[in-house]
């Protein structure tokens, strides 16, 4: 599918996900954003050559909005629940240094626990090829094992 002049696009309306959605649109050259803004909003769009129209919705509603808009930017967990597959997407977020804020991680309550042997075993048990395969299967490619990336 190609994005056309004047198409309506639904975006998540919470600050983190809206910024991430706009960055995805910018990565795909549909809009240009003001430089240096970590969590952009639609007010930070500096160029919109296709005159795209934006509808901000609760993130949980973006997949359902596909019946009413040309394009929706949908978070991976919501996409998986709606049976949307990354292979059918017109764009998928690229893993870059900008992705770091959205990486899930295993954390200890205190930095003094950083070297706790039990916690290290949990991390080792989680960061396996089998877990990576399960992530791919369950999330149909929309969630990736972050331990394979250097940020």
Q: What are the roles of these predicted feature ranges?
A:
Residues 1, 102-118:
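A bilobed periplasmic-binding-protein/Venus flytrap-type ligand-binding module shared by bacterial periplasmic
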Residues 1-31:
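A conserved helix-loop-strand patch within extracytoplasmic ligand-binding domains
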Residues 7, 30, 50-53, 67-74:
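Alpha-to-beta junction loops
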Residues 15-18, 60-62, 77-80, 112-113:
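Solvent-exposed loop/turn segments at secondary-structure junctions
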Residues 20-26, 125-147:
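Periplasmic-binding protein-like
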Residues 37-64:
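Short helix-initiation/N-cap motifs at beta->coil->alpha
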Residues 62-89:
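A ligand-binding cleft/hinge motif common to bilobed small-molecule-binding domains
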Residues 114-125, 134:
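Short amphipathic alpha-helical coupling segments at ligand-binding clamshell hinges
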């Amino acid at each position: 599918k190609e994005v056309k002049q004047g198409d309506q696009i639904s975006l998540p309306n919470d600050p983190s996900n809206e910024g991430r959605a706009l960055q995805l649109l910018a990565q795909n050259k549909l809009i240009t954003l003001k430089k240096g803004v970590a969590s952009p909003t639609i007010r930070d769009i500096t160029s919109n050559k296709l005159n795209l129209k934006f509808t901000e919705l609760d993130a949980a509603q973006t997949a359902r909005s596909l019946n009413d808009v040309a394009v929706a930017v949908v978070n991976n967990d919501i996409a998986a629940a709606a049976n949307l597959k990354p292979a059918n997407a017109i764009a998928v977020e690229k893993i870059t240094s900008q992705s770091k804020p959205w990486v899930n991680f295993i954390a200890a309550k205190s930095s003094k626990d950083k070297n706790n042997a039990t916690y290290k075993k949990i991390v080792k048990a989680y960061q396996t090829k089998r877990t990576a395969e399960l992530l791919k299967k369950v999330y149909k490619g929309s969630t990736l094992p972050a331990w394979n990336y250097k940020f």
